[in-house]
Amino acid sequence: MLAEQLKTYLDKAGIHYAWVMAAIVFMFTLATSTTASAPQILILPITEAYGWDISDVSIATGLMYFMTAMLCPIGAPLMLRIGVINVVLIVIFLEVIGLLCTVLAFEKWHLLVSIGLCLGIASGIIGLGLSATVATRWFTARRGLVVGIMTSAFAAGQLIFMPVMAWITTVSNWQFAIAPGLIGGIICGALFFLLGKDWPSQLSLPAYGDDKIYYPPEENTGNAVSISFKALAGAIKHPAFWILAITFFICGLTSTGIVGQHFIPFCADNNVGIIMASSYLALMGFFNFVGTMGSGWLSDRYNNYTLLGLYYGLRGLSLLYLPYSNFDVYSLTLWAIFFGLDFIATVPPTVKLSGQFFGMINGPIVFGWIFGAHQLGSAVAAYGSGLSRDILSTYVPAFFLAGFACFVATVLFVYLLTFKPKFSINAPSEAL
């Protein structure tokens, strides 16, 4: 009822309801980014409180990313089966349980359950599939820009809440650092429940930029798993799927996996405190916000393969630079700006290519598999970097390896540009 009333008001103002959905997703991603950032803020307080090794916590974060990778392909078809709102509410419930159990943990295996399973399942179900689904369903025009805006909320969450969580760990019990994630999740759940809609047709609207109302199939045969695997069966025959999946694996390896989880401990190894290190992540988050929206704008106007090749190459350079920096204010500020502009700039062109190749319904589902590869890369880096640190007493080899992996991704896109493969942009059948 409230959504219909708001839609009537917006119609009078000449504003499409799609922008309301984009705003809600932005706020939800803002809140979930706080939850996703909690392990990297809590890794040092937990190890100091219980005398554990960094690898004891990083194995939990590695499991979290692994679970995310395994469940990403299920998120979009689950939204198709039970609705976006229901999926969001399930995710919020799991995040609340995961955060509470993390701060109450006193055995190592507790973290495997709270961080690894609860937060991992929540992240897997929602992933970036929510942004891809809403952008694909609600926007025909400006889709790349909208994806950039919605995914940039992850950076905005870091900018706003990570320094707050770090500050809480120093002035009060570190357990209270989860408060921003809990409060934000509850607020966003209420917004989705009151204002969220699955399809524009539920409000008798076409997608933004379209002139015809799209009515989805009233019933989709099969469960979420069968829908997901059926979409995958068609996608794996397309060369674009393998290129996007491999490079997105490298994206996860070199962003959320190593930097997202190990930048603060790396700084601690070089005598940079947790608050100062989180401030650099916040600065990185600000420029990530700018970079991701800029990437969305660029992806609507320029060759997406060229953009992705450039993004990965620049990221590789920044990862190779970090170990050689002096870890002083100037060096880390420069790095945070440079890396922040590129942190998740790969998402808008990747989402757009998925929609172009695989269609309005199958596109978000296939992107779920591609994002699963991303999170698998994150899992490898999250655990592998921590293990490498414990064995070698330094993070330097891990960052070098991540930097060179980015160059592999760049070479893949250069290959595509050089040999001009005849990839059709006609979406395959939307049949489920």
Descriptions of predicted regions:
Residues 98, 110-126, 249, 331-345:
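Hydrophobic core of transmembrane alpha-helices in multi-pass small-molecule transporters
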Residues 115-152:
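Cytoplasmic helix-loop-helix junction between adjacent transmembrane helices
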Residues 46-47, 78-79, 160-172, 267-268, ...:
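Interfacial helix-cap and linker-helix signal at transmembrane-aqueous boundaries
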Residues 70-109, 299:
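Conserved MFS/SLC helix-loop-helix module at the cytosolic interface between two early adjacent transmembrane helices
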Residues 150-203:
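Helix-loop-helix hairpin linking two adjacent transmembrane segments in secondary transporters
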Residues 276, 282-288, 294-353:
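C-terminal transmembrane helical hairpin of 12-TM major facilitator-type secondary transporters
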Residues 17-54, 71-75, 162, 257-264:
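Extracytoplasmic
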Residues 39-46, 233-295, 381:
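Extracytoplasmic gate region of multi-pass secondary transporters
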